[in-house]
Regions:
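Gram-negative bacterial Sec-dependent N-terminal signal peptides
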Residues: 1-23
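Outer membrane beta-barrel
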Residues: 24-46, 68-208, 228-230, 238-240
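Transmembrane beta-barrel strands of outer-membrane/channel proteins
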Residues: 37-45, 96-100, 137, 200-204, ...
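Gram-negative outer-membrane beta-barrel proteins
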Residues: 43-51, 102-108, 141-145, 206-210, ...
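Outer-membrane beta-barrel architecture
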Residues: 82-84, 122-125, 187-189, 235-237, ...
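Repeated loop/turn-to-beta-strand initiation elements of outer-membrane beta-barrel proteins
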Residues: 91-94, 129-133, 195-198, 242-250, ...
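Detector for outer-membrane/organellar transmembrane beta-barrel domains
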Residues: 227-365
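Outer-membrane beta-barrel "beta-signal"
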Residues: 398-411
C-alpha cells in the first residue's frame, strides 16, 4: 500500500495527522492507480450572543441572537473519494486525479440537498528534470499554504452553527486567511531544487460578488469576469528537514474586472484590478510546531475571493488577514494539542461606506488523537467573533462559541 494520499491536500493531511496514511494501489497495465480518501463527521454545539442587525450573520454567528444549535456535520474537509493514476511514457511522467466530495449533513426530512462537490479533475505531465504542467481543476495557488497549514483542517473551526446542510464548515477561512478555493487552471510547477520550488499559473477569472455580509452598504459587482484576461497566480517556497524542520512561503494573485456594475446595477461603472499577496512560515522541533501567517489585498474582499471587495461606487476595498498557531505532539501517545488565533479585516472606504472596518476573529483550541494509524479522534473549541466598527452608528458585535467532537478517517 502506498504511503501517500491521492488528494491535493495530502501534504497537509500527512503533516497534520500523527499517523501514517495509505492509499489503495492497483497496478493496471502501464498505469498505477491510487484510490484514497477521507471520511469525517462531527457533533457540534454552538452558542450565539451579541448584537442583532445587518452584518452580524456570517461565519456561523447566527444573527447576534442568544440561541444555540446542535448539528451533525462534516468538518473543514469534505468527505473524499479520489482516484489518481500515473505512468511513464515517452520520457514523461503522466498522471491524473479525479475526486468526488460528499458531505454528511442533512437538515430536512425527505430532502438530502446537493451535498456534493467535485473539487478535482486534472491531468499532469512533466519530468523531474524540468518540472510539471497541470491542466484542469484543483486547489488554487494563492493562499493554498495558509489552509494547508491550518490545524483545523482535521477538524471543524468556524461555521458549524449556521452551515448545517453545507458540504463543509469554514475552519479558519475568513478568520485569518482567504479561501484558496478550487479553480480551473493551467499551471507550471518547478522541480524541487534542494528544498526550493515555485508554481505559476493562469486560473479562471471570476466575477466580483456582493453579499449581505457587509452591513449598511451594498457592494459593486461584475458580470464579465476578467474580460479577455485570466487571473494570474503564483507561489514560491523553501522547505528543509532535520532536527529543526520547517517551511517558508510567499504567494500572490492579480485579476482584472471588466465592466464593474455599481449598486444600482448600472454596468460599465469602471474597470479595476484586485491584487493580493501573503507570506508564512512554519517550524517544527522536538514535537513543537509554530506557524505564522500574514496576507494583504486590494479588492480581494473578505473570506472568499472577490466577495465584498468593491464598494457601491466600484472602488476597491483594502483587507488583511493573519494568524498564529502553536502545536505540541505528545511523545508515545501521538496526540497533537494545538491553539491558534487569527483575524481578517475589511476596511471601509470613507466616501461610500458607513463602516470603518469589519473584523472577523477566532480562537481555537484542539486535540487530535490517533487511535489507529488511519483513524483520528478530534475535539475542538472555537470562539468566533465579528466586530463592525461604524463611522456614526453604534458599533455591532456578534459571537459564536462552538464545541466539536468527532472523528476523521484516512484511507
Amino acid at each position: 500500500m502506498s504511503k501517500k494520499l491521492g488528494l491535493a491536500v495530502a501534504s497537509a493531511l500527512l503533516a497534520a495527522a500523527s499517523s501514517a496514511n495509505a492509499g489503495i494501489t492497483i497496478p493496471a497495465g502501464d498505469w498505477t492507480l491510487d484510490i484514497g480518501g477521507v471520511v469525517n463527521a462531527y457533533y457540534t454545539h454552538t452558542s450565539f450572543s451579541g448584537d442583532t442587525g445587518a452584518g452580524t450573520g456570517p461565519l456561523g454567528l447566527g444573527d447576534g441572537n442568544a440561541d444555540s444549535t446542535a448539528n451533525i456535520t462534516t468538518g473543514l474537509l469534505p468527505n473524499y473519494l479520489s482516484v489518481s493514476g500515473k505512468t511513464r511514457q515517452n520520457d514523461l511522467d503522466v498522471g491524473f486525479t479525479i475526486s468526488i466530495n460528499p458531505g454528511v449533513s442533512t437538515t430536512a426530512s425527505g430532502f438530502q440537498g446537493a451535498q456534493q462537490e467535485n473539487r478535482q479533475a486534472f491531468l499532469t505531465f512533466g519530468d523531474k528534470s524540468w518540472g510539471s504542467i497541470k491542466l484542469g481543476k484543483d486547489l488554487g495557488i494563492y493562499a493554498s499554504d495558509a489552509i494547508l497549514n491550518d490545524m483545523t483542517l482535521l477538524g471543524v473551526g468556524s461555521g458549524a452553527g449556521s452551515l448545517a446542510g453545507n458540504t463543509t464548515t469554514l475552519g479558519r477561512i475568513g478568520t485569518g486567511f482567504m479561501y484558496a478555493d478550487w479553480k480551473s487552471q493551467v499551471a507550471y510547477s518547478s522541480p524541487n531544487w534542494n528544498g526550493f520550488s515555485f508554481t505559476v499559473g493562469l486560473t479562471q477569472a471570476w466575477d466580483a460578488s456582493t453579499s449581505v455580509n457587509t452591513p449598511k452598504n451594498p457592494n459593486a459587482f461584475s458580470a464579465h469576469r476578467g474580460g479577455s484576461q485570466t487571473a494570474y497566480e503564483g507561489k514560491a517556497s523553501y522547505e528543509w528537514a532535520g532536527d529543526v524542520a520547517g517551511k517558508v512561503w510567499v504567494s500572490a494573485i492579480t485579476q482584472k474586472f471588466d465592466n464593474i456594475s455599481d449598486a444600482t446595477s448600472v454596468s460599465g461603472t469602471s474597470d479595476d484590478r484586485a491584487t493580493a499577496w501573503d507570506l508564512g512560515a512554519t517550524v517544527n522541533v522536538a514535537g513543537f510546531g509554530l506557524t505564522g501567517y500574514y496576507g494583504k489585498g486590494d479588492g480581494i474582499g473578505q473570506t472568499v475571493q472577490f466577495n465584498d471587495g468593491f464598494d457601491l461606487n466600484g472602488k476597491s476595498r483594502d483587507s488583511d488577514q493573519w494568524y498564529v498557531q502553536g502545536t505540541y505532539t505528545i511523545p508515545g501517545a501521538g496526540t497533537k494539542l494545538g491553539v491558534s488565533y487569527g483575524e481578517s479585516t475589511l476596511d471601509g472606504n470613507s466616501a461610500a461606506d458607513a463602516f470603518k472596518d469589519i473584523q472577523d476573529s477566532m480562537w481555537v483550541i484542539g486535540a487530535y488523537h490517533p487511535i489507529t494509524k488511519h483513524l483520528n479522534l478530534v475535539a475542538e473549541y472555537s470562539n468566533t467573533e465579528r466586530d463592525v466598527n461604524n463611522r456614526a452608528a453604534p458599533d455591532a458585535k456578534a459571537k459564536a462559541k462552538t464545541i466539536s467532537l468527532g472523528a476523521i478517517l484516512f484511507f
